[in-house]
Amino acid sequence: MKANSIFNAIRHGILICNADGCIEFFNRVYGEFIGRELRDVRNRPITELRPGSHVPEVLRFRRPIENILRNENGQEYFASIYPLVESEMFNGTISLVTTIGQIEE
């Protein structure tokens, strides 16, 4: 089973950024949330799409930020951002996004 299949089966938005804060991957739910296709924004800095993103902070301090309540462009949501470490190398971040509508369902 491929990781993309697993990520797209999850009902929460998933965003993966590299160590430079550029978008590497997001699942279908996150794409619907931001109204973009991955192919159109891959390798662009997340701050171009989400200026208030906390990804740069997690990249800088290499510590997770959990359960941030955000409201951007009329979208209210919770986000948790975690550093990605592989073989003791810091590789970027993974963000989990839950919209208020998803909580109420």
Give short role names for the model-derived ranges.
Residues 1-33:
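Sensory modules in modular signal-transduction proteins
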Residues 83-105:
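Sensory coupling linkers of modular signal transduction proteins
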Residues 15, 82-83:
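A residue-level detector for well-ordered beta-strand positions
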Residues 34, 38-39, 45-78:
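Terminal output helix/cap of sensory domains in signal transduction proteins
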Residues 24, 75-78, 91:
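PAS-family sensory domains
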